[in-house]
Swiss-Prot record:
Source species of the chain: Agrotis ipsilon
Protein name as catalogued: Adipokinetic prohormone type 2
UniProt record similarity statement: Belongs to the AKH/HRTH/RPCH family.
Assigned GO CC terms: extracellular region
Domain of life: Eukaryota
Modified residues (Asparagine amide): 30
GO biological process: neuropeptide signaling pathway
A single MF term (Gene Ontology): hormone activity
Main location (coarse class): secreted
Signal peptide: 1-20
Length: 73
């Protein structure tokens, strides 16, 4: 009896998942999270982004060293 209940429960869960996948529509066009041509910024390149991240890491490292030197950590 318990095995039949578990099988029916699994089948019901799968039916819900499958029904959700069948009703999904990909034909909605551009949603609110898509990038429009007006929002694209070609001025930013990957090298600049990496350099900004590097500068952030260096500045945080300097702050940590200063705190360790002053005995605050």
């Amino acid at each position: 009896m318990c095995r039949i209940f578990i099988v029916l429960l699994v089948v019901a869960a799968l039916a819900i998942i499958i029904e959700g996948q069948l009703t999904f529509s990909s034909g909605w066009g551009n949603g609110k999270r898509s990038i429009s041509s007006e929002q694209i910024n070609d001025d930013c390149n990957p090298e600049e982004a990496i350099f900004q991240i590097y500068k952030l890491i260096v500045s945080e490292g300097e702050r940590i060293r200063a705190c360790q030197r002053d005995g605050k950590m």
